[in-house]
Amino acid sequence: MALLDDVKSELAAFEGDSPAAIKAQAAAMIRFGGGLRPVQNTYVIQAVFTSLDVAEWLKNTLRNTFGHEAEINHLTRQTPNGPVETYVVLVTRNVVALALQTGLVDRRKQQVRGLPSEVVNGSIAQIKAAWRGAFMARGFLSDPGKASFLEIACPTEEAAMALCGVARRLGIQAKHRTLRSSERVTLKDPDAIERMLKLMGATRSAREWTGKRSDGEARGKANRLANFDDANMRRSAKAAAEASEKVQHAFEVLGDNIPDNLRQAGQLRIDHVDKSLEELGKIAEPQITKDAIAGRIRRLLQLAEKTEKARAAEGK
């Protein structure tokens, strides 16, 4: 958790944004950290964070940018892994006005389930700020040496889809998935993770994460090269890397229109570039043969090629 805490503290210290971007960040922090809550025939706005720096940023921004006072309540929750500190930013006055200002409700005072339209259709600076705020509220980052991922837990499916949509405007493909009834937005490509960290403003943490990951990968590769024939391994690694690039391109072409079995096979190829087809088949759920996984990847690439040709024909 130390690196994740460092990332969130670095993001909380980020400066230089425009007023519109600051508002987008605050709106995302409230949307992903909590939101509008009914309490005893009235409403409050609350957002729960695991970082005091993050909570203080929101409290100060609500006062300085929106003109609303907030309080921070410190709570300690006992878990099997030890105590967890949380910080609740709470607004109890002029709640409806703040909800309108931050896009929690629209002009008809209906709750917005995704991101405010001003953010979704806003500038690149606003989009980066929205991702920053969402990550500060509910972001997770893999430890170096483990399978790479950057993930944000989302309050609704609409919020997850909106976050994926604005990520595409940044040139990054984020995936929406449902995990035990929880909506998640995930990045698994290390280069995309590093880029997103930098876009959000965590440049120092991005360098640290990438450096430690590279060290771990170098050690792993050295161990594997010591146990296998160099030429064969490099040849296989090159073929797997090329296949992974083709699958990534197929995902970009097809978007969400991919059969689940083909998507699973393609994702395994992307997530485990160093593994053989036989190994991919063994880690698939349920397990399948190497011929089956090769066939699914082949059909995925054929489907993408067919789709590209159809689009090219339509564009003539």
UniProtKB/Swiss-Prot annotation:
InterPro entries (alphabetical): Homing_endonucl (IPR027434), Sporu_reg_WhiA_N_dom (IPR018478), Sporulation_regulator_WhiA (IPR003802), Sporulation_regulator_WhiA_C (IPR023054), WhiA_LAGLIDADG_dom (IPR039518)
DNA-binding region: 276-309
Pfam families reported for this sequence: HTH_WhiA, LAGLIDADG_WhiA, WhiA_N
Any one GO MF annotation of this record: DNA binding
Biological processes annotated in GO: cell division; regulation of sporulation
Gene3D superfamilies cross-referenced by the UniProt entry: Homing endonucleases (3.10.28.10)
Source superkingdom: Bacteria
UniProt keyword annotations, A-Z: Cell cycle, Cell division, DNA-binding
Described function: Involved in cell division and chromosome segregation.
NCBIfam families with a match to the protein in the record: DNA_bind_WhiA
PANTHER family, per the entry: CELL DIVISION PROTEIN WHIA-RELATED
Family: Belongs to the WhiA family.
Protein name as it appears in the record: Probable cell division protein WhiA
Organism of origin: Bifidobacterium longum subsp. infantis (strain ATCC 15697 / DSM 20088 / JCM 1222 / NCTC 11817 / S12)
Organism classification: Bacteria, Bacillati, Actinomycetota, Actinomycetes, Bifidobacteriales
